[in-house]
């Protein structure tokens, strides 16, 4: 994080986060909070997952978490586990009025965000449908949105018969479908 800020001459809050699969979205949440608190006027948030060693695959295989097919058949009865991969994603965030004033192209509006952790569940990699539903409901409330207004949901969905089902249940309950 410091190297990027140095080379791009960025100032303001600067830190790296580690929250497993949710690190990138946690970074977006933290960046949006920094903007709301006037700690900065623009934020760069993102996530990186680079598997640079076979140790990761060995650990997943030992835990019986690796999928047998690629791509992983998410939300499917044929789901057999995760297929890890490398990825890098980053976005620039700005307050809406500032982006309009500066003539920036606006690709989306983050109406609200929130963070939670599921606590003790069936296992460390297993989500809690109740806590996920509560978080979704909290974000909808903060954004003043009715569940019927939701047009798209981006899900974690790793291709696991257990966790995909739990995530589906959580989203369905929160959106009351």
Kindly give the residue locations of the regions a language model identified.
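Condensing-enzyme catalytic core of the thiolase-fold
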Residues: 1-177
